[in-house]
Structures are given as structure tokens and as C-alpha cells.
Amino acid sequence: MKTYEVELRALISKEQHNSLLQHLNKLAEGEIDNAKTYTFLTSKLNIKVKNQITKNKAKITVKKGAEYQQQVDETELLINPKDVEKAVKLITALGFKKHISSIQKRINYVLDEITVSLKHETNWKYHIEAEIVVNTKTKIPVAKEKLKLFFKKLGIKPMTEEETRTLINSIRKKYGLEEI
């Protein structure tokens, strides 16, 4: 089934992270999802091979659209965690020569239809991400408004696509990848 991920993010301080952790733990049970991720980025594709260490799972995620976009067409394929290195080699063999490796510490919360993730990642540092997955493009605007309202209630300003693009380009430059 085709799905569309609608997502907003915000960079936060360690103090904000800790405060949000306490707040979200009162609203829902958090699920730890620490991972080692290999990200292959182009201007039109975001391919991630993710070894979800704490869940003993792994997956390949392909997002059509640039990493900075707030809504993308997303497809996932579950793989055996033992096959993560093979998946990275396969994607590299397809012409994606460089990738960004990162370690991510993540706690996910499900609040109604919103999945909220508090994260600390190698390149993004502390940040919060909130997403809604919809099955038709017509539902994207409503989902985006719900996410904006969620961030507003938290007192956090989500990043714009341009702010996200600037951050991603600085990360891409660090790893010798062309800017998008």
C-alpha cells in the first residue's frame, strides 16, 4: 500500500529534550528505538538502511522526495538485521557511492495519530520529529495542520523546509556529497 509521510521537525536543546521526555512520558509510553543508520541522499531520493538495534529488526526505507521536504512518498522493506551490510553494498552497487552513517538514540511515542520521536543523532544532535502517515495525497494538508498545532501546543517552532535544507546541505558537505 502506498503511503505518504507528513513530518515536521525541530532542533532542540538537551534541556528541552529532557523536559519533553518528562512531558511525553506522562502522555504515553515511550518505545526505545536506537539504531545505526546508513543514509543515501539524492535530490529526489532518500534511501535508508536502518539496523534497529534495540528492536533486533532492520529495514530499508525509500522516500521519494528530498530529505528536507515535509511530505514524501514512502516505501519500507523489512530485512534481517544480519543483512544490513549486504543491503548497504547492494545500494552502493546500484550507483549510490557515498552514504552518511549515523548513530541514533530515539524514543517514539504514539499520541492519537501522531508519532512523536525524541532523538539524538550524530549529525542532527537533539531534535524532535512528529509525523502522520496518510494513504492519499488529499489528506496531506490536514495532517500538516495537525502537526503544526501539535508543535504550537508544545511551544516549539518547527523547522521550515528551507531551514531543513540548509542543515541537510551542511551535513552533505561534511560527508563530501553535493548540495541539494
Segments the model singles out, each with a brief description of its role:
Residues 136-167:
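Mixed-charge, glycine-accented linear interaction segment located at domain edges/termini
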Residues 69-74, 129, 140-141:
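A short, polar/proline- and glycine-enriched secondary-structure boundary/capping micro-motif
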Residues 97-140:
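Conserved, surface-exposed functional patches that form binding/active-site neighborhoods
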Residues 1-113, 157-180:
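N-terminal strand-loop-strand beta-hairpin
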Residues 27-30, 79-82, 128, 135-138, ...:
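Short, low-complexity, polar/charged sequence segments that are solvent-exposed and flexible
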